[in-house]
């Protein structure tokens, strides 16, 4: 723009001068749409035809009709006004439909008539049309061609820049107007200028404009006031915005919506709804009932706070006010339901919406992506791409879909998406290119990640962060450290995101030395002030097991955020200290810190690891007291916690009580049934899940396979493994194969299990799979295979005592005592010790522990006495000590005596002594329950008429009336 503009201080002087002048600078010739004579039937009919054509979108027919009426410049005044009004309707329709080609045809038609092109009203309409079509340069061209410019035309061009978010140009034009003309801004000018100030980082300019508003006496104007409220809210000055709102002499619905949005955007969720209630209470006559803009403003609050109840209430208002057909509102509702974990509700709205736009599709793609549902994400995406030319995917679509490809099994889908993006030239967008770099790295396709990265013309810190972050989350995080060195060579310095990725890589590598180097760089460059960086440092030391350092860093934090508390709780949990994790939780409660759903997840996780159903119930009570029970994360954690504490009935109650079931909640319940060996229930729930429209994911199949494994359903387990691959396109991981191999091995199909390892698995078998095979070799006394598997285990984990114990037990079962002695001698030479069997039971808010063979504990004589009675009773029912469970070369009498000292028997007997009749006994054991204790517990449950629940390190056993839930298959 070639113009010499005055700085703002001089502009103030000009304003003072102009306001002292008597004459008004405002033009008086205002266009009046009623200027056509009302008794002109033909004229009215003509305008109705034009209006109808515009409403139906038939702009070509409308244009041809108007074109016939454009005559010479000497036509009558009435005819001229008629044509002008018709052209105005057509220009407005072209702008609404963003039909710039039609707009240009009209512009050309107007330019051909001297009288039309000199008409102020039409010129203003043309400027506005180009603005609506997203072409502010054309608006400016028309404006600059005007010989004389009135305020409406200045407002139109300022509005054009504002509408298209060219905020620098807005201010330049505004200053040009007040510097070079005698015109004073009005209540149409200022809202556009103030909006521009809101979109700029320099708050001072907005404050200066506010000063001009005060000088011109427009501060009490409702339109200007609304703009100022939004300006202060956008820059985070919530108190100032509220003060302006409170002193407004007149408020319209936009005023209320603006203030509600200020609260919403600045995280004042409760205040948003309180103000909404105040708006409706003050105007009970319906004058200010919520409109689409109101509801669209409060829905993100519901999503952010995961307040599904409030979200449904807003949805109810939409239906009641008959706004539920509005596209923008439906899109907001879909977004809210998706972010609250209710993807099914979002799908229902999506399917019922016949007028979908790209935002609708993007919302659904993003919803499935946020759930980690790759199958659902690509289903919606393919439907969108198959829809023809009506709706086209854009960069946002790709950015929503790409993150869901985070594993090598999703590489084909990622490549498919990449091809489409290349064809549409989306990859030239830096954000899209960065997303592909990160996802290719996460999927392990480093060559593709590098190829996309090198294709970025101008690499920024963000580009390097995408590569470094992707490598950090890949199977080889060392590559992120190499990329960091290349970044430094290129002359770019790491930022907060870079160091967070590097810390993540060090955490995965458990490299304390490298992590400390990164921490040193952070301290030297004052990056510790960034909360995310500080939390990443905490996470590093947590992964490296440096809990003293974690506690010291946490204690040094002046302002402890909720996330920092959660990080420390999770850290103790990950390092096997659930009691300390609960101690931190108690501190939070004492300090009055309000926990959210996500915060409670590690608390329930800690309760799952401790032998205390009581603690879990207390945590549940806390969630109920603070109205967190409807949170999707809480629901899943509760289901999991009760299942792992042996109360599968309570898990089922929580699940069945959910109003909205997410994929995660289905998975938690299926896995709960799985670890309890309730295969029929797990399979039934799996089928019901699919009927309700939820797509199973890899965790769903893990739960089903676990259930089949614990129940010995080999045929069904293999069928579900095949279905996972063929029907759902999911690639089994090591956990899935571990279930299948354990299932085959315990059924005696050892050769088949070994073939699965050798032929079907794309990854190298981990120690868990080899341990499972060795355990199966022990059960079925397959010495040859057992020794080969043990050799593999010793190669992978040479210092794990349980590997030697498994081999020793195999030899003992075959009576090869000399080999047993050699294995134990080798363990002694390596200073390896077998974990002693230990069991726990909670009684009267205390946890009692029992170690195998322990004879010096309080109440031992009482335990010994009751066990003698119990042994006598169950012997009459057929109990015979299973001395094969003793892995030592002893006499039969010595073996029987050793069986009596097993920790689960001690805990069970003590529980019977200390509890009243009919009470369920819950025992927790660190190792797998032996055959002898299993047989004894079954018969004791019948003799004593008690339900006994034993959780060992593999699964749950529910003993009742002489029967175990595992069906003697474990």
From Swiss-Prot:
Region entry Type DYW motif, spans: 876-970
Protein name, as recorded: Pentatricopeptide repeat-containing protein At1g18485
Keywords in alphabetical order: Repeat
Repeat as UniProt keyword: yes
Superkingdom as given in the UniProt entry: Eukaryota
Gene responsible for this protein: PCMP-H8
Region called Type E motif, residue ranges: 770-845
Segments for region (Type E(+) motif): 846-875
GO molecular function, one term: zinc ion binding
Keyword set includes Repeat: yes
Species of provenance: Arabidopsis thaliana
Repeat region (PPR), residues: 119-149, 150-185, 186-220, 221-251, 252-282, 291-325, 326-356, 357-391, 394-428, 429-459, 460-494, 495-529, 530-560, 561-595, 597-630, 631-661, 662-696, 697-727, 733-764
PROSITE patterns, per database record: PPR
Family: Belongs to the PPR family. PCMP-H subfamily.
